[in-house]
Regions:
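Helix-start/capping segments and mature chain N-termini
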Residues: 2-50, 72-236
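Ordered, amphipathic secondary-structure segments that act as subunit-interaction surfaces
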Residues: 54-66
Length: 236
């Protein structure tokens, strides 16, 4: 019943990117689902590094998934976390050119769709059916991704956080249960503030997005990508 959480950590030049942030978010997701983490931070870091080494990953990803474990019976009521050992799975993907994606140079085209996901998007679970459907909706009409819209306001992309820029101000939805607390999002906003750029964390509408000077998305596997079109409206 989707009692599984996951994290994906990028690897560049053989090094894990923002691992500490991913580990912290993993623990938060586990806590929200009343699950225990069977691996310490040091052990998890060591396993990630060993996987990168033995698989000769220079640019790529490490995928981690933790499920509640195998209960004695099929039931909506989950077993006592102190009596059931979680199941941990990790694997790597070799992705040469991860940091130099042609799509990042060209920019992505976005469509908007209704946000029909469950309410706790802040927990990074494997409950990804609707985001997957949204990505396919975009592909079918020649776009690259979809921004989801709730009550007239953009929440996020199918697997990324959404931003617009207006009058030299970066605008993105504030943290809540409505969006994933992106690790790359946190890094981008931190760098922006260090560079004394204006940042406004608030809801923004589709109309604001259509009229934006610029727009972009961020994620752990795609880093930062410019958005050049939303629902057929050219951006920038």
């Amino acid at each position: 019943y989707k009692r599984q959480v996951y994290e994906v950590t990028s690897v560049l030049d053989g090094k894990l990117i923002d691992f500490k942030g991913h580990a912290k978010r993993l623990n938060r997701s586990l806590d929200e689902l009343d699950m225990k983490n069977p691996i310490s931070y040091e052990e998890l870091l060591a396993v990630h590094r060993e996987l990168v080494r033995v698989n000769n990953i220079d640019e790529g990803l490490v995928y981690l998934q933790i499920s509640r474990g195998a209960p004695s019976d099929r039931d909506f009521v989950y077993p006592n976390p102190d009596e059931t050992d979680p199941t941990v799975v990790l694997f790597t993907q070799n992705k040469p050119g991860l940091a130099n994606s042609p799509l990042a140079n060209k920019g992505v085209k976005i469509i908007s769709i209704d946000d029909e996901r469950w309410g706790r998007r802040d927990i990074k679970t494997v409950q990804l059916l609707y985001p997957s459907m949204g990505k396919m909706m975009a592909k079918k009409v020649g776009a690259d991704d979809a921004w989801m819209v709730q009550d007239g306001y953009v929440t996020e992309g199918t697997s990324n956080n959404a931003y617009i820029i207006k009058n030299n101000k970066i605008i993105t939805r504030g943290l809540s249960n409505d969006i994933l607390h992106g690790i790359t999002r946190a890094a981008v906003l931190r760098f922006a503030k260090e560079a004394q750029m204006q940042v406004e964390e608030r809801n923004f509408t589709l109309i604001e997005a259509y009229e934006a000077d610029e727009a972009f998305i961020t994620s752990a596997s795609n880093f930062v990508m410019p958005v050049i079109e939303i629902d057929g409206n050219k951006i920038g």
